[in-house]
Amino acid sequence: MRTELDETKATVRRALEEVRRIARELRPEMLEQLGLVSALTALATKFADVSGIAVQRRFDDELPQLSDEAELAVYRVAQDGLTNIARHSGARNVELALERGPSSVTLRLVDDGRGLGGAQPADGGGMRGMRERALLVGGALAIKTGRRGGLEVRLEVPAEGAG
């Protein structure tokens, strides 16, 4: 019984290593070359140009160092969140923020669209993908109605070496 458990643990460990390897290979070139803040700036600029939705960027200075996997998760959640905003929200404005925590970084996307209307967010492919990315890096994802209506997507990921 113990041997089977050890073999199962080893299989899970190998699978996780493979997922991480694939994620690294899928890392956008901009993220690899310029870093997270520059990659998100470029993403926001392109999004605003294509969608016509104004993006206000707010990035804290001196963000804690993130692992490559956590940076990729933040970038992909921002990308998926912006895509959902363009498709579903009817928003005219969105705030894209990176906030420094003592041992984490938080991505916030807040729009002024129609929000959830009291409903729970649909768990479509985009939302499910965001949740899975958060879990893979030990992060936490919250999706809720924003303070002034609209929708807020919040992803907190641990800094490298934290936790």
Language-model features: locations:
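Coiled-coil dimerization/phosphotransfer module
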Residues: M1-G163
